[in-house]
Amino acid sequence: MKTMLILALIALAATSVVAQLDTTCSQGYGQCQQQPQQQVNTCSALLQQCSPTPYVQSQMWQASGCQLMRQQCCQPLAQISEQARCHAVCGVAQVIMRQQQGQSFGQPQQQQGQSFSQPQQQVPIEIRRMVLQTLPSMCNVNIPQYCTTTPCSTITQTPYNVPMATTCVGGTC
C-alpha cells in the first residue's frame, strides 16, 4: 500500500510538468535568448522511472509514459547550450534529492513550481553521478566536463530549468 502511494505521488509529480520562460530577442540578430522560470521538469521523473537502473524502482511504469517523458525532457535539453545543460543536470539532481528525502521521512513530494535553484544542502555525489551518467546517454546530448567536477551549489547560483522550445521569426519571438 505504501509503495502504491509512493508510485502514485511520483506519477503525479511527473505529470505536473510546467516549463515556462520569458523570451526576448536580441536586437539586430534575430536570436532568442531564453530566460527560464524555475519549474519542476520531467527529467528527474524520467531518470527515476525509466532508466535501466532507476533510482526509485518501479515495476508498474509503462513504456509509453517513459517515451513521453523522454520527449518532454530530451528535446528541449538538446536545444540549449552545454552550459545550460550543466545547470539542468544540477536542477534534476536537486529534485531527485528532495524527492528521496520526502520519501525517506514520509513528507509530501515536491509541489509544482517549487524552486530548486537555491539548494538547502549539497546534492549527494551518488545522485549527481547517476544523473551525469544516465541523462546524457538517454537524451544523446553532451554535458560539459566541468559539470563533473564543479559543485552544484556553485553551478546553480543562476536558476535554471529545461525550457520548452521557442522559435524566432525575423527577430520577433
Curated annotation (Swiss-Prot):
Instruction: State the family it belongs to.
Output: Belongs to the prolamin family.
Signal sequence region: 1-19
Q: Which domain of life is it from?
A: Eukaryota
Q: Molecular function terms in GO for this entry?
A: nutrient reservoir activity
Matching CDD domains = AAI_SS
What species was this sequence derived from? Answer: Triticum aestivum
Q: Name one Pfam family in it.
A: Gliadin
Query: What's the protein name?
Result: Avenin-like a5
For this UniProt record, the keywords arranged alphabetically read as follows: Disulfide bond, Seed storage protein, Signal, Storage protein
Where do the coiled-coil regions begin and end?
none
Q: How is it modified after translation?
A: Contains 7 disulfide bonds.
Function description: Seed storage protein. Not integrated in the gluten polymer through disulfide bonds, unless incorporated by reduction and reoxidation during dough making. Increases dough strength and bread volume, but decreases dough stability when added into a base wheat flour.
